[in-house]
């Protein structure tokens, strides 16, 4: 019992914490998220996930496509080996409409936090596997313009999460994101 209390005390003192996203959208209609999107802002729990152009989770979402099975196909672009590479990720549906399983980019979940379907979509990619727990979130918009309302909602959603780096893009950068 003493060892258990000591271990618990050390864990709390050392700041060991799980990254948990508690806010996901209720009643997501996957068909309404279909179409073209632009990555307006990104944030991550670990600076190394976004700090360089070729960082592991610095990806630019281009399009979301619901599949007939209820999964979500994510088309994105990412810098690899000094050039822009097109990627396709299949996010598998779960029992929770706004949560999807993935096996890509070293992540294992995609969580939709919020969307109005017409202007913005906020989502996070989570890796809950020990010891490399990580979280990266993005604010997507339908047009290559800065949407202040979407950014405010993104910042509000991030307040409850352990984010250490945040990037935002202006309209010129949105148009010039990693294009193949």
UniProtKB/Swiss-Prot annotation:
Under physiological conditions beta-lactoglobulin exists as an equilibrium mixture of monomeric and dimeric forms. Interaction with LMBR1L is controversial. One of its GO terms (molecular function) is retinol binding. Primary component of whey, it binds retinol and is probably involved in the transport of that molecule. It holds the Pfam family Lipocalin. Keywords: Disulfide bond, Milk protein, Retinol-binding, Secreted, Signal, Transport. Synthesized in mammary gland and secreted in milk. The gene is LGB. It comes from the Eukaryota. It comes from Capra hircus. This is Beta-lactoglobulin.
